[in-house]
């Protein structure tokens, strides 16, 4: 299964402490966050990795190269202009497997990816998300699921919230089916949550 790691953002909130390296390359105990992410994937057999890069992408490409010394096969898509956090997917869709993992590049995790993928396949979903509580749900997109864990509603941070919802947000770990990229999306920059995932809420496909 192909893994796509999104590493093209500018990481503006981190500029004050790391202006010369992209956020996924910030070291934690001496090793970049992205290296730890790739290590976790490879340990579970997910070695076919495509990284989308943009701002300071050369730092990532120089560090990981073709991925062989990390036990992976890594290729890259370089965004010459910002495409939003999902725009690059439409540029590389011919390289994707029918189902693929899509991960944020700046997340540290310890999860069973094979179980995650199997859950997605068992439910014949277009999109499967890993969710978690966070410390600032008031400015995050909140996900409301039914008793069967199907996403019933997706509230972007700018949406009104006239009632109380539990604190459940997208962790940036997804299994997607390539058919999600068959839709026509308006605009030059494409937002994953608002334009691709949110429309699936309430359809039984996520």
Q: What residue spans do the PLM features occupy?
A:
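Residues at the starts of beta-strands that form the adenosine-phosphate
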Residues: 2, 47-49, 73, 126, ...
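A structural signal for short hydrophobic beta-strand segments in well-ordered beta-sheet cores
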Residues: 25, 143-145, 197
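Catalytic-core segments of class I nucleotidyltransferases/pyrophosphorylases
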Residues: 46, 100-101, 108, 114-121, ...
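Conserved beta-loop-beta/alpha segment of the NTase-like Rossmann-fold superfamily
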Residues: 61-62, 66-147, 183
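Short, well-ordered beta-strand micro-motif
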Residues: 27, 144, 175-177
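Conserved beta-strand segments of alpha/beta enzyme cores
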Residues: 24, 73-75, 150, 205-206
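Alpha-helical elements of Rossmann-like donor-binding domains used by nucleotide-donor carbohydrate transfer enzymes
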Residues: 36, 40, 59, 91, ...
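N-terminal glycine-rich phosphate-binding loop and ensuing alpha1 helix
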Residues: 1-61
């Amino acid at each position: 299964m192909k893994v796509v790691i999104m590493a093209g953002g500018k990481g503006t909130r981190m500029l004050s402490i790391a202006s010369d390296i992209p956020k996924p390359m910030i070291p934690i105990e001496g090793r970049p966050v992205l290296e730890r992410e790739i290590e976790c994937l490879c340990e579970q057999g997910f070695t076919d990795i495509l990284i989308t890069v943009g701002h300071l992408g050369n730092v990532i490409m120089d560090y990981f190269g073709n991925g062989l010394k990390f036990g992976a096969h890594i290729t890259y898509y370089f965004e010459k202009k910002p495409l939003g956090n999902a725009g690059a997917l439409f540029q590389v869709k011919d390289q994707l497997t029918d189902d693929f993992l899509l991960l944020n590049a700046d997340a540290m995790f310890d999860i069973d990816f094979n179980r995650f993928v199997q859950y997605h396949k068992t439910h014949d979903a277009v999109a499967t998300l890993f969710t978690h509580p966070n410390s600032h749900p008031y400015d995050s997109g909140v996900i409301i699921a039914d008793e069967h864990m199907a996403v019933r509603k997706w509230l972007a941070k700018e949406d009104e919230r006239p009632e109380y919802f539990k604190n459940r947000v997208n962790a940036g770990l997804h299994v997607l089916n390539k058919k999600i990229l068959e839709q026509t999306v308006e605009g030059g920059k494409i937002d994953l949550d608002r334009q691709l995932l949110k429309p699936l809420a309430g359809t039984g496909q996520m």
